[in-house]
Amino acid sequence: NNIFDQFFNDFFSQNPNNKKSLGSGVLINKEGYIITNEHVVARASEIRVALGDKREFKARVIGADMKSDLAIIKIDSDQFLPFIAMGRSDDLMIGEQVLAIGNPFGLRHTVTTGIISALNRNIRVGKNKVYSDFIQVDASINPGNSGGPLLNINGSLIGINTAIYQKAEGIGF
């Protein structure tokens, strides 16, 4: 195994026998509630959460909605849990600067920046699934970012990174 092969295995290889998946989420209160995507936790037999301070927790699903692709999971801790303030998505403007945070390709705690490209987008996933009222951004979103926070420039939560348009770069939702 040479270094070239190792690079491609680390970043591009898909092991069909590997039952693990990777996603992101965002703590929304000190009680340990986390918003993520439904597709991140769907069919999971165990959910593990790693915080930026390297603490790890087992989590449980509190609720999930396939139609909106959102889920709430919970971790339990008797220590302080850092959480993000909720923003408002009803007064967003096209051109507004945003930050997308996540774990693209397993690269933990990655931050990318961009702008809101459009509002109220409907996107089709597969043949029968349509998601409504999405925020379109040009911040880099990749596999592993799903469930991570989309923040306004003040650091308030305004959305959840959910999908990318795979036929082009720079189109995320």
Model-assigned labels for residue ranges:
Residues 1-173:
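Serine-dependent protease modules
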